[in-house]
A protein has these predicted regions:
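Acidic, metal-coordinating catalytic segment for phosphate/diphosphate chemistry
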Residues: 1-19, 92-93
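Unchanged
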Residues: 46-140
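Short loop/turn segments immediately following the C-termini of beta-strands
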Residues: 30
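A short gly/proline-enriched turn/hairpin at secondary-structure junctions
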Residues: 39-40
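A conserved beta-turn-beta hairpin within the catalytic core of GNAT-like acetyltransferases
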Residues: 33-36
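Charged phosphate-binding loop/patch that engages nucleotide di/tri-phosphates or the phosphate backbone
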Residues: 135-158
Length: 158
């Protein structure tokens, strides 16, 4: 018997807030979304992998960024669920959403070291934005995640 989509488990994931020297936030526009939505690097945690190692791995896989230092692990975990239109499509239908652990990191490299044309590219474009712009550029079902992340980051950097 097939599981109901609403009974699917949450995927264990990480998200990374990358700040440059001017405290601007790295965001990238996804290949698979035709609208002008941007997101911070994020992804799943592999079996046997801890959250921090997953964050470093995902960041490098998606952006080629290696020169970062951990500023702080954000408090708690933040969960989002996929809207009905994406249930059963994203992640090969295995999950209904993600439960994410977020990390704040400082990028110590140069912009020309960032490369989104990776082995398995996820992004079309990238840019640095002000922290307050985060909630203006994100897809609707992740808005509450970005609001929470933004508030935590602002407390740390201000």
């Amino acid at each position: 018997m097939k599981k109901k989509l609403s009974e699917l488990p949450l995927r264990s994931g990480v998200g990374i807030v990358v700040l440059n020297k001017q405290n601007k936030v790295f965001v990238a526009r996804r290949i698979d979304n035709p609208k002008n939505f941007w997101q911070m690097p994020q992804g799943g945690v592999d079996e046997g992998e801890n959250f921090l190692n997953a964050a470093y791995r995902e960041l490098e896989e998606e952006t080629s960024i290696k020169k970062v230092e951990l500023i702080q692990e954000l408090e708690g975990t933040i969960t989002y669920e996929l809207p009905d239109r994406l249930l059963g499509i994203i992640w090969k239908g295995k999950y209904r959403g993600q439960k994410q652990k977020w990390f704040l990191m400082r990028f110590n490299g140069e912009d020309n070291e960032i490369n989104i044309k990776t082995k398995n590219p996820e992004f079309l474009d990238w840019k640095w934005i002000e922290i307050d712009q985060l909630t203006e550029v994100v897809v609707d079902f992740k808005l509450h995640v970005y609001k929470e992340v933004k508030e935590q980051v602002k407390k740390i950097i201000n």
